[in-house]
Amino acid sequence: MAGSFGFAGILWHNYLTFLLVNHENAFSTACEIVGPVKGSINDFARHDFSIFKELFDFDLTVLDNVLGTSCCSLICDYTNVDENSKLFNKRIRDRICTLSRRLGQADDVEEFMDDMVAFYKDFGVGKLGLHKAFRLEHLQTEGYVRIVPITKIAHVQLDDLVGYEIAKKKLID
C-alpha cells in the first residue's frame, strides 16, 4: 500500500489517515466545503475521533517487544523507494501525509477533530472529494458504468492556458 500510494514515515498513521479521508459518512460530508458544523453529530464524531486518537497514540514498539520482532519499528520510519503515487496525484498524497503527521502530533481529541474538519473543508472526502478529474469506465460484463479518478494530472493555472482569453476574463470577473 505504501508503494502504491507513495506514503512514507509512520505507515500506521498514513493508513489510519487514509481511512479517515476516504470514509464518506454523515460528519465528513457535512463538513466538506463548509467546515465546522453544529449539532449532535459533533458528539458522535468526537467519540469516533477519540478512538482514532488512541490508535494514533498506540506505541507499535510494544508489539515488537511482545512478539520479539522488529517489524513494527520498520513501518514507523518508512522511506519510500519512489515518491510518485500510482493511485493519488502528488498534491493529494502530500496533503494526506501532512495530515497524518498533524494527527500524530495532536495533543487532544479536539485538536485531532479540528485538523480533520479543516481537511474536509479544504479538500473534501472520498473519491469524488479528493480528486479533480474523472473518467467513466464501462464494464460490459457487469452492465454498469463506474466513475474512476484520474490520478496523473498536472496542476494547471489560468496563466498556463493559451488562448481562451475571453473565457478566462469571465472566470476572473
Spans of features found by a protein language model:
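Conserved helix-loop functional segments at active or binding sites
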Residues: 173
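Interdomain "pre-motor" coupling segment immediately N-terminal to P-loop NTPase/helicase cores
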Residues: 81-147
